[in-house]
Amino acid sequence: MKKSLFVSSAMALLAIASLASCGKNTQDADPNTIQIYAWESGLGLDWLKQTVADFNASQSEYTAVLETSTNASTIIKTLDLGTSNAYDLYFSSLGTFQYYDSFATLDDVLEYKNEGESKTIKEKFYPGFLDSERDPDDGKYRLLNYGNTVAGIVYNCDLVDEKDLPRTTDELSNLVLELGNKKITPWLFYNEPGGLNGYWNYVSSAWAAQYDGLDYYYNHLMTLKDDSGNTPSRAVFEKKDGRYKALKVMEDIITPNTTHSQCTSTNFTTVQNLYLKGQAALTVNGSWLLNENKSTANINMMKTPVISSIVEKLEDTKMTDEELSEIIKNIDDGKAYDADTYSCSLNDYNRIKEARTVIYNNSAEQYIFAPNYSNALDASKAFLKYFFKDSSILTYMNTLHLPSNVRLDNASLYDGSNDSKWSKTLFGMAENEGLMVRTSRSPVLRDHGVNAFAGVQTAQSFLAGNPSDRKNADQVWDELLAVIDEGWEAWTNE
């Protein structure tokens, strides 16, 4: 099996090399022609195709050429070719940071102010993105991102009334039971054999961050750094923290009785189409859902319910879930803290408020980068400056009716008055800094494609029809520990 995989990989690389030999490389290329390679994911690329056309029409010095693929791995494999690589600029996800040191710095793009605008590109970015992309060693930017997509729990508005939306995970559990009692299937999501668990990792990571707090999540868990500053710390990776608490929530709400039979399907298109036809009330997905399926289904995304076990981390550890929910309601209503309004301390209020704003934003993983050996680097930067100007951002927003990763310098250019409820919700969520993957995370995670759950199956473990195959949260956690035990030496000995 390993031999055949190697041969397949070698053949793929040979094919890419053949394509490169037919085109340009960094030694003989036209420095004024920008070869762009872009990943076509759920957002499509109509917006980028239009921006490329507009850029080419706007000036005569440079020419941008766009090539696309629905397979991010195919795109990234071109980086194996080094200076024989034909591409100058990428819009894609990255499985690992194997090639990161060969990416050019893009700080001068961020410091640029487009003509007629009052802010630099850097000043236009929504909160969190630049923090996630800043190099932890030298503070420079070798990665930027495109888009502004969040992932969370989606609900069918015809099956779940807005007044019944859960503010806590205990309330989410009650909602799942109530739906079942009404003969409505609560959950339908797809089975991804990779590390995302049918997008559930986005929600479970949010719950983990809610429980432990963002400081712990970013500065200890994701950096694998202990309280003494030692990193990588295996003890931190194995600590039974908010990740375990998230698994306990999932164990409660995901069962054979609460899930659609198609939850075992690995075909996300089939599952999403069934969901959008009303086959279940809830799913886990992201901003791209309606665009990817060309649907106008009556759905919306809820704020991620606050994990009820957060009370274990509060000063008031005896706070009831009803009290927690009421505090969250007041926060949602925009009520400022005072002792008469809130039945909790200021510290607990701040902790709960932070948790309420946590929703996973995966656009920080949709990267823009340029190889530093490209002789069209100046041209690529000229394109990026154009890409982040208001007219290009407006193209993105008008095409998708979703927020971009940067705000318009002139907000009045976009008319969202006729946007759907779905779009308006997602524009609202963009105002809060999302939970994001950062370049400062531990090389154990960053360079080996390992996530906070060590890549183990979570959601699928709880819904197996055969009782002998079904696992509980403790068994999934034991599997996580086993994966860490098996991989730790390879991850840390480089």
In which residue ranges do the predicted regions lie?
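Short, well-ordered beta-strand elements
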Residues: D30-G42, Y62-E67, L89, R142
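Extracytoplasmic/periplasmic solute-binding protein
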Residues: D135-Y146, A151, S173-R234
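Conserved C-terminal helix/tail region of periplasmic/extracytoplasmic solute-binding proteins
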Residues: I393-L394, V406-E494
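Extracytoplasmic/periplasmic substrate-recognition and gating elements
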Residues: G139, S295-P403
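Hinge/lid segment of periplasmic solute-binding proteins
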Residues: L94-A151, S173, L324-K353
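Glycine-centered hinge/linker elements that transmit conformational signals in sensory
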Residues: V176-L179, Y218-S265, K294-S295, T304-I310, ...
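Extracytoplasmic "Venus flytrap"/periplasmic binding protein-like
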Residues: D54, S58-F125, D158-R167, L274
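Short, polar/charged alpha-helical segment
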Residues: S41-E61
